[in-house]
Amino acid sequence: MLKGIKEFFKSFDNMLWGYKKVFKASPEYVIYKVLHAALSALQDLLLSVFLLAFVLSCIEQGKSFGYAAKYILIAAAFMTAKFIFESIGTQKCLNRGIEKITRSLSLQLYDKAIKMDMSFYDDPNFYNDFVWAMNDAPTHILLSFDLLHWIVYVAVSAAVTGVYVATQDAVGVIAVAVSVVFRVVLHVIAVKKEVKMAEEKKPFQRKRDYINRVFYLNDFAKDIRLSNIKDMLFKDFKASSRDMEGVIKKHSKLLVFLSQCYYAVTTVALNGYLVWLLYGYFFTGSVATLGMVVSLHNAISRLSNSLTSLANVLPAIQRTGLYVEKMRRFLDTKNLMPDEGTKELPERFDVKFKNVSFAYPGSEKTVLKDINLDIPQGSKIALVGYNGAGKSTLVKLMMRLYDPTSGEIALGDDNIKEFPVEDYREHISTLFQDFQIMAATLGENISMNDQPLDEERAKEMLDLTGFTPVYNRLPNGLNTRLTKEFDDEGTSFSGGESQKIAISRVLYSDAKLLILDEPSAALDPLSEYTLNHTINELAADRTIIFISHRLSTTRIADKIYMLENGQIIEEGTHDELIEKKGKYAEMFLLQAQKYR
């Protein structure tokens, strides 16, 4: 019991947190939703409880048409005013407010995502919350206002009808109280049963969802056409459906019984009270008019439904609060990697690794062990080794996407932690192995910022990477839209062409340190040779880190580091390492045989 109360207040606190966020983004949206709910409740009560009873009483008592029309016109004026308020509010407050709120919440999420430690991507529980927050949080926070609208509506309805019934007939209050207690108890039992049924269905539903994805995702399109796996999937889908039917059948009898009891309690309470009112009207005179009979009966019905709805608000608040909590937890998460540096970056970008070791968060396996590197500005460094050697992890530390478990990385004489992370990363430009072409123009894909594009420089970089023949065929030059994400006429490129764009992006920047992870993986040997020499000449005064499996790239490096199992096992120039006849020489000669 105590745990349930704590969970409720926690969910309620989360809802208030979400409402504050929304009010800050669009106060007019919140005010409109609350006022609309209150006015809607009053309008419904006016029509179903008071106006109908008033008209019947006027007819029964022989009142003049003018007398009745005066009050009907007042009611009509109220409804007209409410309609005008609703029409203007929908456009001015509701629709605009939704856009403002979505924009505000999304920008907060994007800003947090950019600043979030990379280590959080390695935590599956946090990553699930992160994905949910990015995809669904704004929608669910807006949906929570539908709950607020409902709460205000039933609260106003319950308050008005409660006062009205209490002042007219105390028996009605007793009838409502008994009805509500039974209905709430039945509802709680039914909800628990439905939750249990949903939990039992979940494994089968998950399997059906997976099969559904297999048939519409592009990733599986070729496999299901070139194999007989579809027969097995059909069989599994039918089996999962039958299992779900079994779960539903198992729980359906009790749920039907509870539903019938709920209906019976409602019917007995309301019809019983109607009999009481009619008895008072025809025999005792305790109810003066037929209009009062209709009015009190409708009021009791509304009061009963409103109080039952308010009782059911508790699980709705808990459920909605859980959704909001995910976004709150995501935005409130503190980075494990502090950004407390205040020093200005030195003129030279000389990087040093001093006895650096590293293990990914949550893992006891050491990925890098006692790494020592000296990378003066302007040097050309190659990191080589087989998959899993630790090359990509090493450059992630260099970019300060992670901090070392032990040892330090220095820029000049200071630990890189002494510098603001954003300032430090501004001087690094990276071509990742899994680089992405953005759904934007070619020019925007090269500049990767919102600053005015230096078109001549962008064209020069594209030319240096050998992209010019493709560029000359483009309909709109640097303004050509890439990918078909937003434009059916968008242009898509081959892997090699896309890689040339990505390399142009790196060269276009003014960064002092360029990190190229497999820069020529999608290129033919001739293009690779030309590109490597072009990069080397163009970035003569900038540091370049090459990560490569194809060792033809490494020949232009000033120094080569061979990694294995997270350790540097060999270092030197290409010629020095060939003379040593170690692992590097063995790897190089094996690759050279492919071109003989």
Feature-to-residue mapping (PLM):
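Extended non-transmembrane interhelical loops and adjacent amphipathic helices
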Residues: 1-16, 95-142, 204-247, 320-333, ...
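Cytosolic ends of transmembrane helices, especially the final helix of ABC transmembrane type-1 domains
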Residues: 229, 296-331
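Transmembrane helix-loop-helix hairpins at lipid-water interfaces of multipass membrane proteins
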Residues: 31-85, 161-194, 272, 284-290, ...
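Alpha-helical segments in transporter systems
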Residues: 28-50, 71, 75, 141-151, ...
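ABC-type nucleotide-binding domain
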Residues: 344-596
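Membrane-integrated ABC transporters
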Residues: 1-44, 66, 90-94, 123-159, ...
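An intracellular "coupling" helix at the cytosolic face of ABC transporter transmembrane type-1 domains
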Residues: 24-28, 132-144, 196-203, 213-216, ...
